[in-house]
Amino acid sequence: MRKMLAAVSRVLSGASQKPASRVLVASRNFANDATFEIKKCDLHRLEEGPPVTTVLTREDGLKYYRMMQTVRRMELKADQLYKQKIIRGFCHLCDGQEACCVGLEAGINPTDHLITAYRAHGFTFTRGLSVREILAELTGRKGGCAKGKGGSMHMYAKNFYGGNGIVGAQVPLGAGIALACKYNGKDEVCLTLYGDGAANQGQIFEAYNMAALWKLPCIFICENNRYGMGTSVERAAASTDYYKRGDFIPGLRVDGMDILCVREATRFAAAYCRSGKGPILMELQTYRYHGHSMSDPGVSYRTREEIQEVRSKSDPIMLLKDRMVNSNLASVEELKEIDVEVRKEIEDAAQFATADPEPPLEELGYHIYSSDPPFEVRGANQWIKFKSVS
């Protein structure tokens, strides 16, 4: 009898030492999924669009929440490191636009392709790279995803082609990637992203034309965050209906602050392209909390009240959180646990990114070729042999 009482006492003692939130989460029965109504997309040259209701599973909801929180916290840490002068040079943050990168990835396959402009940190993460590799790239360290030589604008991963610094220049490249998919007979699509500021570039319309002529599996995606650097879309474009810019290419305008809207629209667009109908255009209406880059305080051309209103009414992370809690897909305590885990991951990555060594000077010309070239190149010094690996 004494042994039994002692055993019961040990069990109760162990339970009492666990955080109350963990005990609550472990004992609570959550719903496996829930159905939500989402905003209808505006359509151009399409008879029907994505569904206006969608099912979110508990598993997917927790995954999306963690990914968006990771992108948010990673960008805030980048802001901090930049202000400490540990990150130098160009740095464009995407906090506020997390539903775009996470939602797009949720709507495609890992074998599909993606190319974007210089606001690329979130996409680099959703394409499969770690926070460690991204922050180390921002700080110019050897452990970065581009060996510390690409920085904020030039990050790469498998089936992810950057990170491109020239405004709009990635759009023809995206059409070329889609051409390769079709030429090689692969059931793959290419997501080609650009901003509202780049939407007026002539090369974009040339890419539209070629993609339509050859019926390429290319999803042209305009991330409309309302401002091209410091110029509002109304001052920069005679028409702000970017989803209609393809003219002969079908298009849809999507609530880019709602991850479920983005996911369903991406699934719809990808299915359209895979069916052989050619390209399609998506406009994601979103918002960036930071300025254009770290050199832009972001409040000279918009008010602090405007930013705060978007944060309070349309924040993508809060929208998903409210849906999950109100539908019994998760509890507030469980999501707080995820927040704590994400913060720890970011801090660990930041420590690595500040302690990892910088690449040696002799490796400056390395990693240009995919395999070691059988020749020497005359550089600033003597004849040197470039290497593809270090």
From Swiss-Prot:
Cofactor dependence is on: thiamine diphosphate; Mg(2+)
| PTM-bearing positions, type N6-succinyllysine | 63, 244, 277, 313, 385
- Locate the residues binding pyruvate: 92, 118-119, 157, 165, 167, 196-198, 225, 227
How the protein is affected by changing residue 232 to A? Answer: Abolishes inactivation by phosphorylation
Explain what the record says happens when changing residue 300 to A. Answer: Abolishes inactivation by phosphorylation
In the UniProt annotation, what is the result of changing residue 293 to E?
Interferes with substrate binding
Q: Which residues bind thiamine diphosphate?
A: 118-119, 165, 167, 196-198, 225, 292
Q: Give its E.C. classification number.
A: 1.2.4.1
> Would you indicate the residue range of the signal peptide?
none
GO CC entries = mitochondrial matrix; mitochondrion; nucleolus; nucleus; pyruvate dehydrogenase complex
Q: How is it modified after translation?
A: Phosphorylation at Ser-232, Ser-293 and Ser-300 by PDK family kinases inactivates the enzyme; for this phosphorylation at a single site is sufficient. Dephosphorylation at all three sites, i.e. at Ser-232, Ser-293 and Ser-300, is required for reactivation. Acetylation alters the phosphorylation pattern. Deacetylated by SIRT3.
The places in or outside the cell where this protein is found are: Mitochondrion matrix
Q: Which UniProt keywords apply?
A: Acetylation, Carbohydrate metabolism, Disease variant, Glucose metabolism, Leigh syndrome, Magnesium, Metal-binding, Mitochondrion, Oxidoreductase, Phosphoprotein, Primary mitochondrial disease, Pyruvate, Thiamine pyrophosphate, Transit peptide, Tricarboxylic acid cycle
How does it associate, per the subunit comment?
A: Heterotetramer of two PDHA1 and two PDHB subunits. The heterotetramer interacts with DLAT, and is part of the multimeric pyruvate dehydrogenase complex that contains multiple copies of pyruvate dehydrogenase (E1), dihydrolipoamide acetyltransferase (DLAT, E2) and lipoamide dehydrogenase (DLD, E3). These subunits are bound to an inner core composed of about 48 DLAT and 12 PDHX molecules.
What is the role of the protein in this entry? The pyruvate dehydrogenase complex catalyzes the overall conversion of pyruvate to acetyl-CoA and CO(2), and thereby links the glycolytic pathway to the tricarboxylic cycle.
Q: What is this protein called?
A: Pyruvate dehydrogenase E1 component subunit alpha, somatic form, mitochondrial
* Source organism of this protein record: Homo sapiens
